Amino acid sequence: MSSWILLAHAETSGFGLNLDLFETNLINLAIIIGLLVYAGRGFLGNLLSNRRAAIEAEIREVEEKLASSAQALSQAQTQLKEAEAEAARLLVEAKARAAAVRQEILDKAAADVERLKATAAQDVSTEQQRVLDELRRYAVAQALSRVETQLSQQLDEAAQQRLIDRSLATL
């Protein structure tokens, strides 16, 4: 019943602070908290120590990865610079080779043009010589044809015999 009275009294008085140590269980709470601190210190210490060791190991691992990554980056940058230098050198060589090949092609084309001109001139000269030879043969054939015609008209049988005899005598 006394708890009913206290409850009724607490309701009527409003909010208040109970300073009775035995009723508020402060001693029990202090003992429990003390035991938790004493007993939990080792457990909590181990837990925090393990967590700290794990974090330190992760930090060391990350620092090692950072160092190896920085080294790999440095090597990659060096290789990039070397590759760029090699590409520039190859470009210069390619341009020089292209210029040399271009000049070689131009020289060969000029030589081919000169050779074609010489061949064409020789072909023209040969054709001219052939035409002249043909014209000479034609002229000789025409002249012989006229001579035969004239000889047959002007020479009779006796004149032909005298001509043959004279030709034989000169031989």
From Swiss-Prot:
Q: What is its main location?
A: membrane
**Recorded topology in the membrane:** Single-pass membrane protein
Single annotated GO MF: proton-transporting ATP synthase activity, rotational mechanism
| UniProt GO cellular component terms | plasma membrane-derived thylakoid membrane; proton-transporting ATP synthase complex
- InterPro entries, alphabetized: ATP_synth_B-like_membr_sf (IPR028987), ATP_synth_b/b'su_bac/chlpt (IPR002146)
Note the SS bond partners. Answer: none
Q: Where are the transmembrane segments?
A: 26-48
- Origin superkingdom: Bacteria
Output the CDD domains linked to this UniProt entry.
ATP-synt_Fo_b (cd06503)
Q: Which UniProt keywords apply?
A: ATP synthesis, CF(0), Hydrogen ion transport, Ion transport, Membrane, Thylakoid, Transmembrane, Transmembrane helix, Transport
Subcellular location, record wording: Cellular thylakoid membrane
> Mind telling me which Pfam families this protein's record contains?
ATP-synt_B (PF00430)
Partners and quaternary state? F-type ATPases have 2 components, F(1) - the catalytic core - and F(0) - the membrane proton channel. F(1) has five subunits: alpha(3), beta(3), gamma(1), delta(1), epsilon(1). F(0) has four main subunits: a(1), b(1), b'(1) and c(10-14). The alpha and beta chains form an alternating ring which encloses part of the gamma chain. F(1) is attached to F(0) by a central stalk formed by the gamma and epsilon chains, while a peripheral stalk is formed by the delta, b and b' chains.
Q: Indicate the family of this protein.
A: Belongs to the ATPase B chain family.
UniProt function note: F(1)F(0) ATP synthase produces ATP from ADP in the presence of a proton or sodium gradient. F-type ATPases consist of two structural domains, F(1) containing the extramembraneous catalytic core and F(0) containing the membrane proton channel, linked together by a central stalk and a peripheral stalk. During catalysis, ATP synthesis in the catalytic domain of F(1) is coupled via a rotary mechanism of the central stalk subunits to proton translocation.
This protein's name? ATP synthase subunit b
Gene name, please?
atpF
